[in-house]
Amino acid sequence: KRPIPANAVAVTFDDGFTNNFTDAAQILDDIGVPATFYITTGMIGTNQMFWVDQLETCINLSTKKNIEVCLGDNRQIFQVGSYKDKVNSLNVIKTFCKNIHKDKKDLIVENVISETGVFPNSKQSLNYRVLTWNEVKQMNTNPLFSFGGHNVTHDTLSYLNHDEAVEQISGSIN
């Protein structure tokens, strides 16, 4: 083994978005830089969007001035008429959602979809499209690239019960 140089860096990518294949992999290959891609295996090959990307798409594309969203036991009115309003509202909603179980988070996402009237899909927001298994396989032929498991569905492990957390971790490796 060689010692790690003082100026060493690790190049990593999180989640498994398609731009890892269409943009990053080509650039990294051209300049000979290795990278590790941590992919959310349950999303690969689907047209699904991560919950956070669904929220961003709904609120960013909304033409409404405000929406009513139930965060826990509190129904709140969020201003979404201006760019600043959208950013502020997204920050509050995302922060709340990061600290709750997936089932409750899914209800909030459905609430936001209903309130905004925007039905998010990866065709609306190409930056949110996830890799296909074919793209992963192609990248995996490059010796510069390695892959690691993120988890299956990108849920916050600390808000899952033990069995759910184990499935998220082991399922992403299998």
Please name every model-derived segment.
Residues 1-174:
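Catalytic alpha-helical scaffold of carbohydrate-active enzymes acting on polysaccharides/glycoconjugates
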